[in-house]
Amino acid sequence: MIIRSPEPEVKILVDRDPIKTSFEEWAKPGHFSRTIAKGPDTTTWIWNLHADAHDFDSHTSDLEEISRKVFSAHFGQLSIIFLWLSGMYFHGARFSNYEAWLSDPTHIGPSAQVVWPIVGQEILNGDVGGGFRGIQITSGFFQLWRASGITSELQLYCTAIGALVFSALMLFAGWFHYHKAAPKLAWFQDVESMLNHHLAGLLGLGSLSWAGHQVHVSLPINQFLNAGVDPKEIPLPHEFILNRDLLAQLYPSFAEGATPFFTLNWSKYSEFLTFRGGLDPVTGGLWLTDIAHHHLAIAILFLIAGHMYRTNWGIGHGIKDILEAHKGPFTGQGHKGLYEILTTSWHAQLSLNLAMLGSLTIVVAHHMYSMPPYPYLATDYATQLSLFTHHMWIGGFLIVGAAAHAAIFMVRDYDPTNRYNDLLDRVLRHRDAIISHLNWVCIFLGFHSFGLYIHNDTMSALGRPQDMFSDTAIQLQPVFAQWIQNTHALAPGVTAPGETASTSLTWGGGELVAVGGKVALLPIPLGTADFLVHHIHAFTIHVTVLILLKGVLFARSSRLIPDKANLGFRFPCDGPGRGGTCQVSAWDHVFLGLFWMYNAISVVIFHFSWKMQSDVWGSISDQGVVTHITGGNFAQSSITINGWLRDFLWAQASQVIQSYGSSLSAYGLFFLGAHFVWAFSLMFLFSGRGYWQELIESIVWAHNKLKVAPATQPRALSIVQGRAVGVTHYLLGGIATTWAFFLARIIAVG
């Protein structure tokens, strides 16, 4: 007789038809809440409807039902993303000059929007070169499409239709996995299987398929494009895939097929999987062969990572075991209990993911210019500036979101009874030490960083340049940063065989890459001016962290309000008779953190914009002389507050202020309008609820007098609502103002 080990039983992890599909609930606003479903008595109703519609915690306390709603909403989100992508590709196919740009990317600007001639708006269609008139776009899609090997507008059409199909599919999936086959809670909590699928599937096979596409489609097509072949003459993608001889003409080792792979003679593939470093002098982008190699390597790493965790076959790591074994000499119970937190609190999970994704997004911002991944991206200054600014803002918002959801976790999901002496408990017990030290650091950084500028302004005003902190007087060189730059500049040849240049030209080493007479990238010098502004960065980041961390650590209780957890995530004050307890909720800390995040990111993007125009971007003559856009004025001008105001904000705002009557005039209007939106926010931030309630009551009196009073009673915004509206307009106004200022400037001079 044969003895078999018992087969692991496959558990059924979905419920069939849990919730019937009905459109009737759509007709009942607020169907998720008993109070809101009754309909409006006062105008507060519409605000509560918006505040709670997506707050699934407030609809039910059943974790399984909440999980299903979140899961289903994710498919809705993906559907919108595919729809948006489809729109981008459709614009490229239908309204753009992509094919013209492809034939001459150095002299023709990218445009994918042509304004219709209504009331004279066609003035916005500027001349982007090659006889095409339209709005210059700065999203980087053209460069991305070229890198992917897209050579015609027909291919863009096909991709747009494909994305539309996927959008519909995602919409269907969201409905199906909520109404027809909804996963059970156990499925959402099976972290090892999730890691298996996300690491090996999404990241591993995703990177592998992209690497395959790059090798078989992107590389040969870009090889032809770089050689100046007409895009219409280049074979179509499927021809490269089906006909190996075509590829073998470009990369002879293709003729040998997979033999070198299985005989471990991998160096045969070094024609198209390279490790060169630096930039391709033809396109000013990273070597596409380096990028293909990178994605292949990433794929291998993640395919291995995806097979490290214990699923149906009892081998591999268990996340719970790893976390509980993670103890240090000073950390008590260590991560014991963290597994339970992360599998039962989606806020805790989301908080970690937002913190990491936000940091990663900021890392992306810094790599997009220092290692420009796509052909002709580095010389498209408007796109470079836009991509940096965009990723910085997004990263800032995600990090504030991380603090918001950490605080919601503390208020709603944290259970102090079964948390004793683990790391989180230990952090909470010495939160006073953490916050007071952080506060001291903020005071130190604020006074010293700002003090250096004030010193320089004073000396400059008194006509004593020799007593200023500058590269030509009292030097404060960023020696550590310069040391890191130098180390990287010396690295090629020592770190990897065959590497000819360092990871980024910005490190140093003297070489410069220019494309079509424009600088793509060159070594970026750091001096006293950078030292000063970097300490402003340190200051603003630390203050943001102070506010957000205080909100999280004191979300449940504080000396002022020991029972804060009972008041919830957002509340205006601790009730009547408790003066001085307003604006202390966890929500209020997020509110305040947003302003400091805005400060921090603004300084970063201003620094970047000016530094690049002053020391990197510009034109190069036949003799090799580089002329920068602002002629290297950053080092001497940005060392005083006055310099920032005069030589950056004011001097560079001339393009947006003088844009009326030109194709950039829309930016002038946005600049004006966004200032108004920003100023509008102050009305909400600087006045109290009672003021508005009094005003409303006299307006209601007038309506009653004329017998036109509505059935729904008007009410002033609550304190929290008013602050929410205020911060929203503050950020929207500020960001849109910056956007108009940056783009009008860089499109005009770049």
Curated annotation (Swiss-Prot):
State the Gene3D superfamilies in the record.
Photosystem I PsaA/PsaB
UniProt-listed Enzyme Commission number(s): 1.97.1.12
> Catalytic activity annotated for this protein?
reduced [plastocyanin] + hnu + oxidized [2Fe-2S]-[ferredoxin] = oxidized [plastocyanin] + reduced [2Fe-2S]-[ferredoxin]
Q: What InterPro entries does the record tag this protein with?
A: PSI_PsaA (IPR006243), PSI_PsaA/B (IPR001280), PSI_PsaA/B_CS (IPR020586), PSI_PsaA/B_sf (IPR036408)
Where is phylloquinone annotated to bind? 692
Question: Which coarse location class applies to the principal site listed for this UniProt protein?
Answer: plastid
Q: How does it sit in the membrane?
A: Multi-pass membrane protein
Q: What class of enzyme is it?
A: oxidoreductase
- Keywords from the UniProt entry: 4Fe-4S, Chlorophyll, Chloroplast, Chromophore, Electron transport, Iron, Iron-sulfur, Magnesium, Membrane, Metal-binding, Oxidoreductase, Photosynthesis, Photosystem I, Plastid, Thylakoid, Transmembrane, Transmembrane helix, Transport
**Subcellular location, record wording:** Plastid, Chloroplast thylakoid membrane
Pfam families cross-referenced by the UniProt entry: PsaA_PsaB (PF00223)
**Which GO terms are recorded in the biological process aspect for this UniProt protein?**
photosynthesis
Q: Which SUPFAM superfamilies match?
A: Photosystem I subunits PsaA/PsaB (SSF81558)
Q: What residues does [4Fe-4S] cluster bind to?
A: 573, 582
Q: How does it assemble?
A: The PsaA/B heterodimer binds the P700 chlorophyll special pair and subsequent electron acceptors. PSI consists of a core antenna complex that captures photons, and an electron transfer chain that converts photonic excitation into a charge separation. The eukaryotic PSI reaction center is composed of at least 11 subunits.
Q: Which family does it belong to?
A: Belongs to the PsaA/PsaB family.
Q: What does this protein do?
A: PsaA and PsaB bind P700, the primary electron donor of photosystem I (PSI), as well as the electron acceptors A0, A1 and FX. PSI is a plastocyanin-ferredoxin oxidoreductase, converting photonic excitation into a charge separation, which transfers an electron from the donor P700 chlorophyll pair to the spectroscopically characterized acceptors A0, A1, FX, FA and FB in turn. Oxidized P700 is reduced on the lumenal side of the thylakoid membrane by plastocyanin.
Protein name in UniProt: Photosystem I P700 chlorophyll a apoprotein A1
- Lineage start: Eukaryota, Viridiplantae, Streptophyta, Embryophyta, Tracheophyta
